Amino acid sequence: MALVIYSGGLDSTVLLYKLFSEGKADGALSVNYGQRHVKEIECARQNCARLGVPFEVADISSLRPLFGASSLTDYSVGVPDGNYADENMKSTVVPNRNMIMLSIAAARAIAIGADSVAYAAHSGDHAIYPDCRPEFAEAVESALKICHYT
């Protein structure tokens, strides 16, 4: 069973519904890191209620100033418009965001007895987001396997 890191956006919603349909969704965790699109968390809550999947929110929004000038967290930085392949989309990078969320989710997964954490990174993301690359996922998986006594 998996704990799903669930923003409430399209990618993680598809992942949650897929795992739920397979009987593998143990719970869902949204992380409020001070993002502008925090309204997605309410969508996540509603979808989890609809499915009967336990839902929690980790509020780390007080860390927002530490993330620097990302257009997703800093209201003084404009949100770019256009194709994700465009150079200007790099302003949407929140440094180390997935590592932070995966660490929090791994701790929660251990606490609730889930045997894995799932997050919706995909190949369309990793051209812009370094923490969506396959080598990142593999490295984090290796680290998480040794960070807890099983």
Regions found by a protein language model. Give the residues of each.
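ATP-dependent adenylation/nucleotidyltransferase module used to activate substrates
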Residues: 1-150
